[in-house]
């Protein structure tokens, strides 16, 4: 069984077996008796590596043995291995030729936080969002069959990701096309109890063996000729298996279900995977693991050790203590508690983001009004719509990138019916080290085109609270988008009063250039404005746009500059240009925002600089345009 470590090593560990097995080809040259020692070395290497860089932590520790077994048994990369979400893929990266580059994890031009097809041939499908693996692996299995290939397709999905409807859509489809594929459920939520002990592991070996499979198929052919006999035999088999395994649902869908087995028992994993490798049709293996396995603190607190920051050197001077500004999510968390206290109609909904969206306090103070729907964004939005129909006031706390998954519901179920639902959209704009799959680059574009939707962009913590008030008290759908991280430490007013919808605020009066700011770039815009003597307008609303303020700015300035941390295409700046065109106002307009590309992972400041959205980039772009217009 795995060794349990108590500390993260600060020096690179000695790993003689891992040194020989940093690719699957090297791994497969090891003897089976060496693999448990290799697992200890890989776990220690992961502890050291993530300790140096920070990153996702607990999930990878929990799949050390499974990762080794998969690459040992299957002929990767020819056999297609698809990881769901990707939080657990660091051991996979270490074993597939990227060990030497793990020191660059989540850094600019370094190893990505999630599997990327462009990074390695072993990363067969790019991920970041959950519940896509079964559909992707099924598509690969079908395409391989059409091409006459015998390669295997394997999807590894967690119990959390399996709660999403998309996963069940794929589970329902695969048996219809008799796909030759394997789905592995990495169940790290349930404990390893008696039914995952020796008897269950023994049963798994039997049920997955060629002998059992051929006997089962042979018996089916024979018994099918006898009226009623095969049905009796089938029910007897299901009853016997049902006493030991919880696979009835998957069997009913048409999958050959095996398990649950201990995901930290390498011999059992290897034997079971070998047996299942050549079985035809859709196969389902239920593996039970422990998140954070092998690192004592993470086993005790898997949520706290989901991800960690890098270790500071032992001899580093202590950082001076300072009172930091609250995170935008914390401002939201305080606001929803305050508004819930004032209005008993308020209900809070989140798709498995209680901690990230800062809903812990709300869930504890108002448990009967808090709803975590798991990874089910579509359901979250329509659930809110149903609640709104009955007079509740739903607040959907959701990351920008994940709201994309509930877009049809946002339009069809909320907006068309003009229902009172407030979307508190966290992680808007660039999010840093998690990269393009988690960036909130498109919400202004896909929200402002929806009739009746009020779309707001607070410029600091106090504005966030004001605009949350405004959206909540508005009749109809509304959205407030705010970024990851902290703001400029603005003084936060404690009231619950709204602002006038569709009205911006002039923050600095200047001449020549007017910078129309949609969001938290206000601070940088003010810095630039001091140098250029420019006017700065905090627009607040993308929709409805303050057309009177835009008209006034156009009449009194030579150049209008729109500034947003959203895709330029279809974003807030586009709304300004569309209005000017409708009003037949001819004016030079410079749109500053995210380019028509995916911005790769780096520190947020690096990403903003790359896009020209820091103070230096904003100033340079304005001066360049001024030079062109003379």
Swiss-Prot record:
Organism: Pseudomonas savastanoi pv. phaseolicola (strain 1448A / Race 6) (Pseudomonas syringae pv. phaseolicola (strain 1448A / Race 6))
Needed cofactors: Mg(2+); thiamine diphosphate
PROSITE patterns found in the cross-reference section: TRANSKETOLASE_2 (PS00802)
Organism domain of life: Bacteria
EC number per UniProt: 2.2.1.7
Keywords: Isoprene biosynthesis, Magnesium, Metal-binding, Thiamine biosynthesis, Thiamine pyrophosphate, Transferase
Lineage of the species this protein comes from: Bacteria, Pseudomonadati, Pseudomonadota, Gammaproteobacteria, Pseudomonadales
BP GO terms, sorted: 1-deoxy-D-xylulose 5-phosphate biosynthetic process; isopentenyl diphosphate biosynthetic process, methylerythritol 4-phosphate pathway; terpenoid biosynthetic process; thiamine biosynthetic process
InterPro entries: Dxylulose-5-P_synthase (IPR005477), THDP-binding (IPR029061), Transketo_C/PFOR_II (IPR009014), Transketolase-like_Pyr-bd (IPR005475), Transketolase_BS (IPR020826), Transketolase_C (IPR033248)
One cellular component (GO) term of this entry: cytosol
Pathway info: Metabolic intermediate biosynthesis; 1-deoxy-D-xylulose 5-phosphate biosynthesis; 1-deoxy-D-xylulose 5-phosphate from D-glyceraldehyde 3-phosphate and pyruvate: step 1/1
Quaternary state and interactors: Homodimer.
Function: Catalyzes the acyloin condensation reaction between C atoms 2 and 3 of pyruvate and glyceraldehyde 3-phosphate to yield 1-deoxy-D-xylulose-5-phosphate (DXP).
Protein name, as recorded: 1-deoxy-D-xylulose-5-phosphate synthase
Residues binding Mg(2+): 159, 188
């Amino acid at each position: 069984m795995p060794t349990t470590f108590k500390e993260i090593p600060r020096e690179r560990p000695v790993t003689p077996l891992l040194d020989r097995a940093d690719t699957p080809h090297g791994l497969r040259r090891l003897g089976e008796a060496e693999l448990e020692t290799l697992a200890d070395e890989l776990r220690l290497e992961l502890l050291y590596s993530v300790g140096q860089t920070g990153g996702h932590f607990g999930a990878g520790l929990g799949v050390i043995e499974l990762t080794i077994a998969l690459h040992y048994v299957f002929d990767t990369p020819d056999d297609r291995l698809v990881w769901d979400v990707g939080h657990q893929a660091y051991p996979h990266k270490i074993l597939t030729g990227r060990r030497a580059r793990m020191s660059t994890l989540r850094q600019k031009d370094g190893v990505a936080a999630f599997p990327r097809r462009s990074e390695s041939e072993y990363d067969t499908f790019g991920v970041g969002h959950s519940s896509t693996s079964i559909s992707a692996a099924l598509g690969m299995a079908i395409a391989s069959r059409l091409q006459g290939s015998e390669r295997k397709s394997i999807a590894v999905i967690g119990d959390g990701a399996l709660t999403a409807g998309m996963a069940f859509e794929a589970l329902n489809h695969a048996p219809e096309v008799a796909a030759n594929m394997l789905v592995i459920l990495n169940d790290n939520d349930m404990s390893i109890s008696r039914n995952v002990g020796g008897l269950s592991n023994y049963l798994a070996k039997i049920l997955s063996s060629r002998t059992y499979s051929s006997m089962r198929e042979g018996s089916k052919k024979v018994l099918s000729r006898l009226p009623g006999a095969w049905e009796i035999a089938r029910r007897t088999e299901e009853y016997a298996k049902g006493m030991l395994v919880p696979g009835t649902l998957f069997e009913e869908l048409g999958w050959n279900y095996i398990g649950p087995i201990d995901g930290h028992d390498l011999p059992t994993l290897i034997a079971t995977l070998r047996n299942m490798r050549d079985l035809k049709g859709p196969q389902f293996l239920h593996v039970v693991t422990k998140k954070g396995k092998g690192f004592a603190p993470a086993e005790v607190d898997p949520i706290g050790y989901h991800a960690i920051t890098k270790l500071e050197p032992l001899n580093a001077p202590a950082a001076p203590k300072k009172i930091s500004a609250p995170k935008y999510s914390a401002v939201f968390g305080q606001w929803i508690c305050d508004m819930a206290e004032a209005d008993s109609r308020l209900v809070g909904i989140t798709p498995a983001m209680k901690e990230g969206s800062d809903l812990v306090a709300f869930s504890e103070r108002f448990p009967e009004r808090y709803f975590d729907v798991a990874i089910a964004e579509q359901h979250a939005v329509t659930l809110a719509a149903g609640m709104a129909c009955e007079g509740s006031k739903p607040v959907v706390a959701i990351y920008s990138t994940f709201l994309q998954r509930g877009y049809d519901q946002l339009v069809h179920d909320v907006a068309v019916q003009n229902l009172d639902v407030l979307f508190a959209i966290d992680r808007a704009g660039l999010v840093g080290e998690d990269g393009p799959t988690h960036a909130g680059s498109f919400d202004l574009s896909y929200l402002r085109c929806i009739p009746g939707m009020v779309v707001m962009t607070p410029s600091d913590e106090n504005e966030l609270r004001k605009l949350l008030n405004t959206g909540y008290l508005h009749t109809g759908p509304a959205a407030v988008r705010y970024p990851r991280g902290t703001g400029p430490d603005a003084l936060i007013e404690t009231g619950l009063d709204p602002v006038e919808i569709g009205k911006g605020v002039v923050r600095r009066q200047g001449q020549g250039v007017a910078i129309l700011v949609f969001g938290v770039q206000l601070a940088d815009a003010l810095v630039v404005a001091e140098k250029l003597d420019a006017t700065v307008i905090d627009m607040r609303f993308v929709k409805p746009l303050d057309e009177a303020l835009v008209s006034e700015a156009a009449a009194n300035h030579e150049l209008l500059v729109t500034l947003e941390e959203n895709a330029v295409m279809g974003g807030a700046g586009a709304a300004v240009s569309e209005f000017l065109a409708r009003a037949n106002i001819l004016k030079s307009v410079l749109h500053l925002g995210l380019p028509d590309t995916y911005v790769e992972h780096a520190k947020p400041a690096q990403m903003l600089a790359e896009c020209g959205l820091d103070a230096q980039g904003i100033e340079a772009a304005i001066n360049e345009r001024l030079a062109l217009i003379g």
